[in-house]
């Protein structure tokens, strides 16, 4: 237990202890995608309780990138101020912060929108899921820009680090998986191509945002012919080459 309470580091961040609060969606916002009183109470309570590093829940890079209408967003400059205020409160109690920037892809259930994905393969044929459109090369360029701009906003909001969400079957994870990505261009097919989008986003964020970068990935889909542990090892090595400061790995994806 003594090691748990010793100082730790992630990139240039010094943590007062090694207790980390991972990102967990609370679904307590609304169509505004703003932080509510609930969020401020929720995160501040962890900081007061002594958590050393708090990663704020999945925060969308565009409106249709939310998992639901109750998710957070950071796709506009007007959304920065609330996050800045949250960080000020958390930092007062000595905790460091990161924000998980994300796009739900085909798992988005936002009303009156059509989800986007690497291929026209629905997550489920049941409500509330919809059949996605296939991302064009222009769409992919736009997706990269959305992630980079959101990372820039995160820095302006005084987050100490950024976590890129490439797990749990959401958009970036969908590009990684051969079960959800059946493209025949440079973003599909072999492992190198399927990892391309994640690596391109990481490269641009590292170039434009001077903050430690964490990438969350799924270790294994546990499905025949799906993403597996060897794929994760390959991706992790490529991420390390690009200067990623930490890899946050979870057991499986949900595709």
Question: Language-model features: where?
Answer:
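Flavin-dependent oxidoreductase catalytic cores
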Residues: 1-254
């Amino acid at each position: 237990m003594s090691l748990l309470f010793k100082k730790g580091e992630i990139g240039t961040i010094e943590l007062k202890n090694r207790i980390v609060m991972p990102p967990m969606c609370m679904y307590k916002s609304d169509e505004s995608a703003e932080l509510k009183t609930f969020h401020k109470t929720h995160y501040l309570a962890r900081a007061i309780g002594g958590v050393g590093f708090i990663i704020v829940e999945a925060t969308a890079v565009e409106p249709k990138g939310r998992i639901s209408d109750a998710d957070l967003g950071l796709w506009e400059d007007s959304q920065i101020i609330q996050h800045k205020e949250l960080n000020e409160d958390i930092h007062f109690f000595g905790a460091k912060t990161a924000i998980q920037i994300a796009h739900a892809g085909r798992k988005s259930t936002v009303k009156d929108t059509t989800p986007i994905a690497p291929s026209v393969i629905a997550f489920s044929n049941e409500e509330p899921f919809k059949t996605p459109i296939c991302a064009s090369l222009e769409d992919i360029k736009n997706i990269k820009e959305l992630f980079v701009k959101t990372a820039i906003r995160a820095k302006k909001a005084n987050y100490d680090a950024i976590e890129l969400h490439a797990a749990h079957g959401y958009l970036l994870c969908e590009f990684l998986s051969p079960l959800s990505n059946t493209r025949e261009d440079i973003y599909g097919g072999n492992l190198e191509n399927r990892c391309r989008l994640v690596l391109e986003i990481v490269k641009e964020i590292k170039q434009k945002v001077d903050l430690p970068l964490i990438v969350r990935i799924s270790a294994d889909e546990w499905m025949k012919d799906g993403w597996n542990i060897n794929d994760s090892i390959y991706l992790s090595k490529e991420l390390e080459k690009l200067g990623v400061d930490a890899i946050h790995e979870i057991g499986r994806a949900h595709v």
